[in-house]
UniProtKB/Swiss-Prot annotation:
Similarity annotation: Belongs to the UPF0323 family.
A GO cellular component entry from the record: plasma membrane
Biased composition (Low complexity): 169-185, 193-208
Membrane topology designation: Lipid-anchor
Record's keyword terms, sorted: Cell membrane, Lipoprotein, Membrane, Palmitate, Signal
Transmembrane segments: none
Protein name, entry field: UPF0323 lipoprotein HH_0014
Covalent lipid sites (S-diacylglycerol cysteine): C27
Native source species: Helicobacter hepaticus (strain ATCC 51449 / 3B1)
Length: 208
């Protein structure tokens, strides 16, 4: 519980990242639990995300925890337990590298065997990826392998459920305001928010 409290405190800290909010074009959804978190994230308009990605002993990465936040930030926890916030430039470069892997069919996000994720893949698998990587969202959300593997990208089923519940609660709290909005709900596609995508995308220079 102390660890969870610490994470929530991080999520309240002022930002390093730049949040962009996007709308999602309606797309066909498969049934089953693995779609539940994706649906929740897509409908969490006006919420950023604070995400902790943890390095595993084999060098792969999983989503450890994530919470709604006013701004979108990603914290990396390495296998030695050291934590640091990733810069926006690092995040942008990692997402760009993972996009290349997706386009070439080499990304574990869309691999039917669902192997271990690299850091960029873990970021895209998280709520932060749904926001910051929204410009490649259709490549993932319309991919059946990504849908099937979504839960295993988290450290545990409990982490997956905590994320789903956190973003559901945030969505419920914001429902009153959303009724007055003419925009579509969700992260991807449409509306003025798409302008924020090109404004906020940086070209980071971090190596892989």
């Amino acid at each position: 519980m102390k660890h969870i409290h610490k994470i929530k405190n991080y999520a309240m800290v002022g930002g390093l990242g730049v949040m962009a909010v996007f709308a999602l074009n309606a797309c066909e959804q498969n049934s089953g639990q693995n779609n539940a978190l994706n649906n929740t994230l897509q409908n969490s308009q006006k919420n950023g995300a604070f995400v902790i990605v943890e390095e595993q002993n084999d060098g792969s990465y999983k989503v450890l925890e994530e919470y709604p936040s006013e701004q979108t930030r990603v914290m990396l926890k390495d296998k030695n337990g050291q934590e640091r916030l990733l810069s926006q430039e690092e995040i942008d470069e990692l997402i760009k590298q993972e996009e290349v892997a997706i386009d070439s069919g080499q990304s574990q996000l869309t691999n039917p065997n669902g192997g271990g994720l690299g850091l960029g893949g873990a970021i895209l698998a998280s709520a932060a990826g749904a926001i910051l990587g929204s410009y490649i969202g259709n490549k993932l959300f319309n991919n059946p392998n990504y849908q099937a593997n979504s839960q295993r990208n988290y450290k545990s089923p409990q982490a997956y459920e905590r994320s789903k519940n956190s973003f559901n609660s945030a969505k419920t709290g914001a429902s009153g305001a959303s009724k007055t909005s003419s925009g579509k709900s969700g992260f991807f596609g449409g509306g003025n928010s798409s302008q924020s995508t090109s404004t906020n995308r940086n070209t980071g220079s971090m190596g892989s």
